Amino acid sequence: MSRGALIVFEGLDKSGKTTQCMNIMESIPSNTIKYLNFPQRSTVTGKMIDDYLTRKKTYNDHIVNLLFCANRWEFASFIQEQLEQGITLIVDRYAFSGVAYAAAKGASMTLSKSYESGLPKPDLVIFLESGSKEINRNVGEEIYEDVTFQQKVLQEYKKMIEEGDIHWQIISSEFEEDVKKELIKNIVIEAIHTVTGPVGQLWM
């Protein structure tokens, strides 16, 4: 039995990640494809993260970084098991978000990556570019929904993309929504059909 693919969607806040994930789930109906999003706010760490994001509690940046990381590690075994059972996972945010946001706040990217080292490695990361309209919509109730901060996050994403150790697919914000939806669907289908070998380990 071939394993499933780990496909991650990344991008700035309000770039359309959740929408595109849901499009995939609807356009490729299958009992071998599941959706997962981070942070998972139902767990102990997830509830702490939710309190932080909604400004109910404050923590120092190092604690915040570790909370997001721990939230992903809570699901590392689940992800590994699902992939080995032939289940493809469509994931809304992953370790790259954690590293980009931490680095945008001044943390060492190398140190932040070390916390995530060993997580299941994605077979494909789809990065959704944000146009000026989407970036300017990044004003909201949650703590990171700030235009200036989001621009810093974007620069950190670009650094990771340029490293070339992960298979990134950048989706331009210039595409019309129906074109973007079809393009992403085809990219995901190809990734599912071409995945080979054992599940890798991220940043090892």
From Swiss-Prot:
UniProt-listed Pfam families: Thymidylate_kin
GO biological process: dTDP biosynthetic process; dTTP biosynthetic process; dUDP biosynthetic process
Reaction equation(s) it catalyzes: dTMP + ATP = dTDP + ADP
Coiled-coil annotated residue ranges, if any: none
Residues annotated as binding ATP: 11-18
Keywords: ATP-binding, Kinase, Nucleotide biosynthesis, Nucleotide-binding, Transferase
E.C. no: 2.7.4.9
SUPFAM superfamilies: P-loop containing nucleoside triphosphate hydrolases
Domain of life: Viruses
GO molecular function, one term: ATP binding
Gene3D superfamilies on file: P-loop containing nucleotide triphosphate hydrolases (3.40.50.300)
Pathway, per record: Pyrimidine metabolism; dTTP biosynthesis
Signal peptide boundaries: none
NCBIfam families associated with the record: DTMP_kinase
Record family assignment: Belongs to the thymidylate kinase family.
UniProt protein name: Thymidylate kinase
Organism from which the protein derives: Rabbitpox virus (strain Utrecht) (RPV)
